[in-house]
Amino acid sequence: MYSIKTDHKLMPRERLIRLGPEKLSNQELLAILLRTGNKEKHVLELSAYLLSSLDSLADLKKFSLQELQRLSGIGKVKAIEIKAMLELADRIQIAGQAVAAPVLSSAQVAEKMMIELGDKQQEHLVAIYLDSQNKIIEEKTIFIGTVRKSIAEPREILYYACKNMATSLIVVHNHPSGLTKPSANDYHFTEKIKRSCDYLGLICLDHIIVSKHGYYSFREKSDLF
């Protein structure tokens, strides 16, 4: 059996070349990303230490840059590389879920966006632009900020709608608290964006609030649509 204590000659990179990435352990894959260890730990020992600080592999996403840097052997550069890897993995997953089929329901959009935004610790507002066949032209992040800051203005959303020559759009934002119940500001914003779309001849199909575990659709549950 492969052992980091007895076999440093056959390193993870060589094992990946010889056996393929699917044969490597989480420890070995992480060691490839970390590249080097430090004076106290070999890179495989460092990756094992990092993984031992997690309840599950998914918890790695929850570490901020600062929290990663506080772990022994993980400096600023390694922390940045880990965060970049996690973000890229998220984007690859999202891109893989994109289909050419038309958007048929709010639930379909909500399921996708729960995966994309559910774990975000800041509020993200995303506009999804569709053509006349309800196929997605572009998904655009309009706003990233804290819950204390006001949400994006409709003009920012409409600018990209015109740029994409969209027929309709869906607005989605997350609640970092995990609660999807809309606030008074959410209602006000929904009214504003719907009026603005009506004025320009665009169709606002829905405004959806998501968290990791659920969603709220203004089209499904309010009288605004």
UniProtKB/Swiss-Prot annotation:
Transmembrane segments: none
CDD domains, per database record: MPN_DUF2466 (cd08071)
Motif residue range(s): JAMM motif: 173-186
This protein's record includes keyword Zinc: yes
Residues of the MPN domain: 102-224
Keywords: Hydrolase, Metal-binding, Metalloprotease, Protease, Zinc
GO terms, molecular function: metal ion binding; metallopeptidase activity
PANTHER family associated with the record: DNA REPAIR PROTEIN RADC, UPF0758 PROTEIN YEES-RELATED
Protein name as catalogued: UPF0758 protein Sez_1052
